[in-house]
Amino acid sequence: MKLLILGGSGFVSGRLAQIATAQGHEVWCVTRGNRPIPEGVHALTCDAHDPAALRAALASAQLQWDAALDCICCDAPSASVDLSVLPAFTNRLLVISTDSVYHPAYKRVPQDETGVYLHDGGYGSSKRQMEEVFLDAAAHSESPFAWTIFRPGHIFGAGSQVGCFPEHSRQPDLIARMKRGEPLRLVGGGKFLIHPIYVDDLCRVLLESIPVSTAFNEIFCIGGPDIVSNAAYYLLLGEILNVPVTIEEIPLAGYLEAHPQFSGHLCHRAYSLEKLRRTGIALPSTPLRAGLQKQVEWLLSLAR
């Protein structure tokens, strides 16, 4: 297939471009050109959130794509750009949202695709407003243009730092700290659940979803095969590094009020994948231990 990726130089978008190319697809990446993109892909340089610039960049390629995959759609305006520009160049769009769209005070375990959403102006709220633009468009249009949205939680793998929870979320010196025997400070002792997904699994599901009609104009929760506490994640990381782990509890009371940016973390993040299962798309299968081992090996290789 001919695939258009909005993004291509980031953690997820770059890996998506690599995997798509390895599968034999021809890939174009839209970036601002400030960072390198994977080898073997075509570069389209513009601000993807500027509709005129995006339209001109896509027109310059003089082709139709089998699908577009937007890894950088972050709010209602960017969703509106997708809907105003992309249908002239493709009939299919995959979008990455976030599990942070849910209001943490009302989440269930496991949480499905319906729920109470944030409207506080933060990251999760902006992503939900993005979703609402697509939902509204689908409800008021008979266009053949079809989208699918996925809500991953913690995405992990080579290309990103380890750590999934405050105060050690994607911390560049986390491995060094652990090797020095420093205690880890986790809010609430890390009692909340997470449902991490290995980056390669997320990319595979995105690509496999392209022709699946039962996924058209639908939103899906997505996560890997393991649901663990945040504390268990760090203990597993210690096992992989062969170092002991001591966890110091940061009181939960008052932390969210002082650090509202972590609202999507200070709750259980465990999801039902039943809706995704019913499409027939193979569910993510990489165990947390296996994916985290690969991530650690990649990070250690950078330090050599």
Which residue stretches match the model-derived regions?
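Mid/C-terminal beta-alpha module of Rossmann-like enzyme folds, strongest
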Residues: E208-C267
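Conserved C-terminal active-site "lid" loop/helix of NAD(P)H-dependent oxidoreductases
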Residues: V199, Y255-A282
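Alpha-helical substrate-binding/gating segment
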Residues: D173-R185, K191-I227
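N-terminal Rossmann NAD(P)H-binding glycine-rich loop of SDR-like oxidoreductase domains
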Residues: L3-Q23
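Conserved beta-loop-beta element that borders a ligand/cofactor-binding pocket
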Residues: F134-C164
